[in-house]
């Protein structure tokens, strides 16, 4: 004996569509919430606490715009001032503005902040940046206005 399943009615189809739409929205909201787990101010607090001293914008500006013994400075790719899109020095790839006032989503994902500081500091300095250097750069970037 075979059981026939009834053909879905319009109501069950619309209910199913509503559940799918709700699930997709929740997944997107969850992803957005995870991506924005912090703020640039919280990142500055974190690095200042690790360094044991508050970040200083003037030191950050000097660090950001100076070559650190190599060919590049931070501003080689991120621009000077970094309130507009930059361009990677070797690949030519466009880079979003670094200043939080010009790009509110910058420095809002802790994992990405750590990843990009690690990668970019190794490119510019051939080592990781210290917590104090990160705090200084963030203090400088947070103080910039578009």
Where are these regions (language model features)?
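C-terminal capping alpha-helices of c-type cytochrome domains
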Residues: 114-146
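Electrostatic cytochrome c docking/interface patches
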Residues: 36-68
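N-terminal secretory signal peptides that target proteins for export/translocation
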Residues: 1-15
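Soluble non-cytosolic domains of exported or imported proteins
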Residues: 51-54, 68, 107-111, 127-132
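Sec/Tat signal peptide C-region and signal peptidase I cleavage site
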Residues: 31-35
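Bacterial N-terminal signal peptides
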Residues: 21-29
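C-type cytochrome heme c attachment motif
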Residues: 62-80, 136-139
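Gly/Gly-Pro-rich "capping" loops immediately C-terminal to redox-active cysteine motifs
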Residues: 54, 75-113
């Amino acid at each position: 004996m075979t059981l026939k399943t009834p053909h879905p009615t319009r109501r069950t189809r619309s209910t199913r569509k509503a559940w799918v739409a709700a699930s997709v929205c929740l997944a997107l909201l969850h992803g957005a919430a995870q991506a924005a787990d912090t703020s640039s101010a919280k990142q500055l607090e974190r690095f200042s606490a690790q360094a044991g001293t508050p970040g200083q914008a003037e030191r950050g500006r000097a660090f950001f715009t100076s070559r650190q013994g190599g060919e590049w400075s931070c501003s080689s790719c991120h621009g000077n001032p970094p309130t507009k899109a930059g361009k990677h020095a070797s690949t030519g790839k466009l880079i979003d503005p670094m200043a939080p006032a010009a790009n509110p989503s910058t420095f809002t994902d802790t994992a990405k902040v750590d990843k990009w500081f690690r990668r970019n500091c190794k490119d510019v300095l051939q080592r990781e940046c210290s917590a104090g250097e990160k705090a200084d750069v963030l203090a400088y970037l947070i103080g910039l206005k578009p």
